[in-house]
């Protein structure tokens, strides 16, 4: 069980998953559709942003779907293996899960015509060298 506060802007290491998360702020980003990256309306996110593992009863509101859904049900619908579910990062603000890492963003956090500041989050695997350095600490 882990919860790590993201450095915004900056790079945050998520050791339990062997990942790093890069957070960048700008007025606009090119709309690059990649599963390891999302663009959010930075002003719609409240409080500290965290990355964490799933917890019993977690819910989120996937974009394009009316209402909310349990994370467990979302994983089942997406046919994500049970063993893999523990390794999927969940990105949250103080109110809700806004991104199921590498899968789906929620409706609320998406940028729109009135967006003034964008936040781009990108997930990368830590290299073996970075993992060795961190194990030595």
Spans of model-derived segments:
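AMP-forming adenylation/ATP pyrophosphatase catalytic core
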Residues: 1-137
């Amino acid at each position: 069980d882990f919860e790590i506060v993201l450095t915004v802007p900056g790079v945050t290491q998520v050791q339990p998953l062997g990942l790093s998360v890069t957070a960048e702020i700008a007025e606009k980003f090119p709309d690059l559709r990649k599963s390891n990256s999302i663009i959010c309306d930075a002003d719609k996110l409240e409080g500290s942003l965290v990355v964490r593992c799933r917890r019993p009863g977690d819910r989120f509101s996937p974009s394009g779907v009316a209402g909310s859904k349990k994370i467990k049900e979302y994983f089942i619908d997406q046919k994500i293996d049970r063993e893999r579910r523990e390794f999927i990062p969940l990105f949250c603000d103080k109110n809700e899960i806004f991104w199921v890492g590498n899968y789906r963003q929620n409706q609320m956090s998406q940028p729109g015509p009135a967006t003034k500041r964008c936040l781009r989050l990108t997930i990368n695997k830590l290299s073996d060298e970075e993992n060795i350095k961190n194990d030595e600490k």
